[in-house]
Structures are given as structure tokens and as C-alpha cells.
Amino acid sequence: MCDDEVAALVVDNGSGMCKAGFAGDDAPRAVFPSIVGRPRHQGVMVGMGQKDSYVGDEAQSKRGILTLKYPIEHGIITNWDDMEKIWHHTFYNELRVAPEEHPVLLTEAPLNPKANREKMTQIMFETFNAPAMYVAIQAVLSLYASGRTTGIVLDSGDGVTHTVPIYEGYALPHAILRLDLAGRDLTDYLMKILTERGYSFTTTAEREIVRDIKEKLSYVALDFEQEMATAAASTSLEKSYELPDGQVITIGNERFRCPESLFQPSFLGMESCGIHETVYNSIMKCDVDIRKDLYANIVMSGGTTMYPGIADRMQKEITSLAPSTIKIKIIAPPERKYSVWIGGSILASLSTFQQMWISKEEYDESGPGIVHRKCF
């Protein structure tokens, strides 16, 4: 492990996108959708080289003839065979490396079932013969990437949203909150409210078009009621979007109604608190002495925090919940879409981290349970 030539591999398996690359790099080399697609139809032409499954971008580009499945739901791996295909694709097709020659750092959502990380460990050592591996908590890596040791991370991706308070490098597990409301739910909601305008999107392939509309045109309103009034009174907020077949659609108040459900989950028929209340509740579960430091270091990470206006709205909402004398600071770095991966890259290249790896020898001696002792 002392050999500096061997760069560790960092793989951040998100519910929506898989980010992979080499430790020490400042950005992931490969970013592709965590999708496995299987043909819906019978192949009739011989010699076409049809495969029985497609992964990532290739599945995305052939989506018209495939059924697309995401093996990771709400941050938990639900289909291990498909997950193995995604890892295989990551190592051999995207990064073009032999996994048996590099230590592998994987990431995981907090409050995941224990069996999940055991199985991850088992597959890395037994299927891919990795020399060493480690499983890190996603939100902790985001904090590394922001250069802090204290703060509360709001990590919101495609499948799951978490708030994780960390003080002087220690995660406070009793105060971690998890919200199963994230990007995929917002895409579904946008599909629904676009139907009210007379645009119908139904299939798994059309859902990807709506996801693109969401990513390009949505924003968070600072004052929702006022924005609704503006949208009703004029057309200044309307934007147009061209569909793949050349048809142009117009989208108005849907632009901010969609991400508003992060703050008002009742829009989706969910009983849970909005993300601002979740952050507040998480801070309130911490010791009274450290709350002040957490309020001053609220770090946003993940793709669902990329909406324009979300940081200002968060500042406003938390300010109205917190005591009036407290200083509140929201940190929303521009690269936050990849901050989990960047944090992993930083962690895996630290010299002090090198003794933390789980080696193949330790695994052979103790079995998959070792992951709970060495990774927390």
C-alpha cells in the first residue's frame, strides 16, 4: 500500500449518477447515469451484436427500445446483479483499469442497512479482487471537500436527502435525519404538473426529457406566493423548451412550483417536513453548545441543491426558524454536484488515511463484518 504509483479509485455510487475517477484528481473522470437497460423487443437482425443489457450512457441513448431500471433506490442498492454490472462498466469501460491493482473507495448514504455495506465489501474483494477498500459516508466527504471539520451537511441527490451534523470531524449519528424526497420525486412531480398544461409525458424515456427540463429551467422562488402572483400577471417568467422531435413547449410557474416541493412536501402528498425544517430539526437534536457553530456552517451538496435561488431561500427560511441573534451562513460551493466525489478524492490521497484501508488479508481473516469495525 505504500507504493505511491498506485492511485486509489474513488467511486461515488449515487441513486441517479455514478461518479468515478482517481484519488488526487480534482474532478471525476467518468460521470454516467446509474441505469441498466434491457431490450423490450425481440432482436430479429443477425450479427447486430445486440446485448442483453446496456449500462449508463449507452442505455440512455438507446432508451427508446429499452426498459430502464435504477439498481439504487433511495440510496440503497436493491439489485445486486445490476449493481455489479455498473461497477464492472465503471472499472473496465469508463476508467479502463484493473480493479485488482488499485484500492477502491466507495461511498454510502448514512442510515443505510448494515447488510448493504457488507455486501459491497464482499463483491469488491471476491468478484473484483480489490487489494484494499473502504466505505465512506457521503455527507462527510462533502464536508472534506468544503475544507471544514465542523458543519451540518445537507446532501440531496436523486434518491435521498440527508442532514448530517459533524463536529470537529465527528459525525453525530443521533442527529442525522434522512428524507426520502429528492430529485427523482421532483422529476415525477414536474411530469404531473406539465400534464395540467396539456403536455403528456409517461414512459421511462420521456421521464428523462422532463428531468432535462427540470435541470435547465427550474429555480427556487424567494417568496413563493409573490412569485405565483407575478407569473399570473405577466408572461415575464415563461421560458420555452424544444423537445427532441422539434416541438416547442412553454413552461411558466411550473419552473418554480417543481422545486418548491423541497420546502413544501405537501405538494407531493408527503407528510414530512421541508428541507429547511429538516436542517433545523437536525441542529436541534445536537448539544446546545455546538448549535451556534452548525448554524454558521450549513453546507449544501448534491445535484438537487443546484437550483438557482436555493441558497437564498434556505437562508431566509432558517433565519425565521432560528433564534434571532444567531449568525446563519449557507455554504453552496459551485462544484457541489460533485463534492462527495471530490471529498473522496481528498480523503483517499491523505497520507494519514493509508492505514485506514481494509486490506484483502484482513477481509480473508474476518469476513465482511470487518467493514463495521474499520469504516464509520
UniProtKB/Swiss-Prot annotation:
Residue list for modification N-acetylaspartate: D3
Coarse class of the protein's main subcellular location: cytoplasm
Documented EC number(s): 3.6.4.-
Propeptide residue range(s): 1-2
Keyword annotations of the record: Acetylation, ATP-binding, Cytoplasm, Cytoskeleton, Hydrolase, Nucleotide-binding, Oxidation
Cellular-component GO terms for this entry: cytoplasm; cytoskeleton
Enzyme type, top EC level: hydrolase
PTM annotation: Oxidation of Met-45 to form methionine sulfoxide promotes actin filament depolymerization. Methionine sulfoxide is produced stereospecifically, but it is not known whether the (S)-S-oxide or the (R)-S-oxide is produced.
Intracellular or extracellular location(s): Cytoplasm, Cytoskeleton
Top-level taxon in the UniProt lineage: Eukaryota
Catalysis performed (reactions): ATP + H2O = ADP + phosphate + H(+)
GO molecular function, one term: ATP binding
Residues carrying Methionine sulfoxide: M45, M48
Protein name: Actin
Organism, scientific name: Mayetiola destructor (Hessian fly)
